[in-house]
């Protein structure tokens, strides 16, 4: 059996790396798209500022074809360096693009012109500029910078240009952080990071882009794989620079820390919380298969080299192997541990189809029960004796770490998975109320099967009465026999009230007059109604009042 287990591990490792060995038999390249890239011919900051204004218009205009908008974005990413043309030639090795690079300069009037001469390029330049400035809305060219006067500002100094190009570069690279992985929540995180650079005096609010411009640039970055590959190549090249980095390179290296391993949070968090915590529960047989998968993925990640942290951004097909669904049990356990330990896990969406609720709760329970435990290997390495270990346990309990921490309890409660028990029998609300009270609302609520029993139609199904959360509705009260008798004896008006005749009304007036004057009422008063043929005999004590009550 030991040999079989070894062969299974080798086979899984072979499957993980299958197809990555060997060379190409034939070069598979699709039809390339031609893009126009404008680069400055000199280091003049006035030329570069005018070119930046032109390129931002080209990126902002959604009506332009990709050959112009993608080329303008490539130029905008490279213009922050001293030699933009060399950067594009050396780092843009995309098999899907064919770059047509054109150098630009300033003419005698201070306007941009193509450095190369010829009637064809002159006509091409006029058509290029005309397309860029052709906006569906004439006011769109003022919506790039938050300062509307910045678009018409031409007399820029060298110091202002350095502040401007640094701010623009930071904003463009920040857009890459969540352009692919989380575009819906990208705006808030981008604002937080930009505020950080404002506080560090690396960026300046005077050159801040508008929200609509950043949304359009983010959308172009997400749509164009060539743009993302070019940005990843720049980040990898900046890493190789070591400590000899310029201001722009340092800003790119700083932003790249947020971009690395984007889309690989499931794999990284599994290593951190599932394995890095070293809980003894990893010895369960159920975890052994997932642990073997993790071993092979670690080897695969290392074999990919420096491109591995960016595999999701460049859409490498290997990224599918790192999906948490391939090691769902271990990932579910790691998410339970992470939500119980780390406050930052509150913003992580773990509601996935492959989440195993039982192993998720196992991770939370392990954290609760292991709040005072110590890793033996680490304790031996640090030379911790039993006295020090007891001191550590008391300190942990006094600090409220683990289940004693109210924040931890609130975090774990946020991720509770509800269990609903289905029962086909009817529900007795009175009995259920007693169970809820005596067991402190821990009894599961039983509801009947909506489909009904066999042979019973859905129309005959009567749903139970609704229950409020945390308490049970009181049972319906039925009237007692005494209350029913009182209700039956209560006088009810007749369906057809009887009308009094004129003579009866006169007799009633006389009767009230005698009462008011204190004269004794006659013993008998004859009242004749309109719906009776015989007079009604009534005494003057109370029967006549009942008759009055019957009249409208």
Swiss-Prot record:
Keyword match Nuclease: no
Region entry Ntail, spans: 403-552
Keyword Ribonucleoprotein: yes
Positions bound to RNA: 178, 193, 258, 352
Region (Disordered): 423-552
Compositional bias annotation for Polar residues: 527-552
One term of GO molecular function: structural molecule activity
Subcellular localization, as worded in the UniProt entry: Virion; Host cytoplasm
Coiled-coil spans in chain: none
Chain intervals with Acidic residues compositional bias: 423-435
Region (Ncore): 1-402
Alphabetically ordered keywords of this record: Capsid protein, Helical capsid protein, Host cytoplasm, Ribonucleoprotein, RNA-binding, Viral nucleoprotein, Virion
Domain of life: Viruses
Membrane-crossing segments per the record: none
Subunit field text: Homomultimer; forms the nucleocapsid. Binds to the viral genomic RNA. N0 interacts with the phosphoprotein (via N-terminus); this interaction allows P to chaperon N0 to avoid N polymerization before encapsidation. Interacts as N-RNA template with the phosphoprotein (via C-terminus); this interaction positions the polymerase on the template.
The family this protein is said to belong to: Belongs to the paramyxoviruses nucleocapsid family.
Domain comment as written in the entry: Ncore is globular and carries the regions required for self-assembly and RNA-binding. Ntail is an intrinsically disordered monomeric domain in the C-terminus.
Name assigned to this protein: Nucleoprotein
């Amino acid at each position: 059996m030991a040999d079989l287990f070894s062969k299974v591990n080798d086979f899984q490792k072979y499957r993980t790396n299958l197809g990555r060995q060997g060379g190409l038999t034939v070069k598979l390249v699709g039809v390339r798209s031609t893009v126009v890239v404008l680069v400055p011919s000199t280091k003049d900051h006035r030329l570069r500022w005018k070119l930046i204004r032109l390129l931002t218009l080209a990126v902002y205009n959604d009506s332009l074809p990709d050959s112009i908008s993608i080329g303008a974005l490539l130029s905008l990413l490279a213009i922050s360096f001293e030699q933009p043309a060399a950067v594009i030639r050396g780092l843009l090795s995309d098999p899907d693009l064919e770059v047509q690079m054109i150098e630009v300069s300033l003419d005698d009037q201070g306007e941009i012109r193509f450095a190369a001469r010829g009637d064809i390029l002159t006509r091409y330049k006029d058509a290029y500029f005309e397309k860029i400035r052709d906006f569906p809305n004439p006011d769109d060219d003022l919506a790039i910078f938050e300062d509307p006067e910045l678009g018409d500002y031409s007399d820029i100094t060298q110091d202002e240009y350095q502040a401007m190009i640094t701010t623009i570069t930071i904003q463009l690279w920040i857009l890459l952080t969540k352009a692919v992985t989380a575009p819906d929540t990208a705006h808030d995180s981008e604002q937080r990071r930009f505020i950080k650079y404002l506080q560090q005096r690396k960026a300046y609010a005077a050159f801040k882009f508008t929200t609509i411009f950043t949304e359009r640039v983010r959308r172009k970055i997400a749509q164009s794989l060539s743009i993302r590959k070019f940005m990843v190549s720049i980040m990898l090249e900046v890493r190789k620079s070591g400590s000899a980095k310029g201001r722009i390179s340092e800003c790119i290296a700083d932003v790249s820390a947020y971009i690395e391993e984007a889309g690989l949070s499931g794999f990284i968090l599994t290593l951190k919380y599932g394995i890095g915590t070293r809980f003894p529960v990893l010895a369960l047989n159920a975890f052994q298969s997932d642990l073997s998968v993790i071993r092979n993925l670690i080897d695969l990640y290392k074999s990919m080299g420096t491109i591995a942290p960016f595999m999701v951004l460049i859409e490498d097909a290997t990224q599918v192997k790192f999906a948490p669904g391939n090691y769902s049990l271990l990932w579910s356990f790691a998410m339970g541990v992470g939500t119980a330990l780390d406050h930052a896990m509150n913003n992580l969406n773990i509601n996935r189809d492959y989440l195993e609720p039982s192993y998720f709760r196992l991770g939370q329970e392990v954290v609760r029960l292991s709040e005072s435990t110590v890793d033996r290997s680490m304790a031996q390495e640090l030379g911790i004796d039993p006295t020090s270990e007891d001191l550590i346990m008391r300190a942990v309990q006094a600090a409220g770490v683990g289940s004693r921490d109210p924040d931890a309890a609130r975090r774990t409660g946020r991720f509770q998975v509800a269990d609903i028990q289905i029962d086909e029998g009817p529900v007795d609300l009175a009995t259920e109320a007693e169970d809820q009270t005596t067991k402190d609302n821990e009894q599961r609520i039983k509801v009947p099967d909506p489909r009904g029993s066999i042979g019973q139609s859905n129309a005959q199904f009567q749903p139970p009465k609704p229950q409020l959360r945390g308490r049970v509705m009181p049972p319906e009260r039925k009237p007692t026999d005494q209350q029913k008798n009182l209700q039956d004896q209560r006088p009810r008006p007749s369906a057809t009230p009887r009308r009094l005749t004129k003579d009866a009304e006169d007799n009633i007036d006389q009767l009230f007059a005698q009462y008011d004057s204190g004269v004794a009422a006659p013993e008998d008063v004859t009242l004749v109604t309109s719906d009776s043929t015989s007079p009604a005999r009534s005494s003057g004590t109370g029967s006549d009042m009942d008759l009055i009550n019957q009249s409208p």
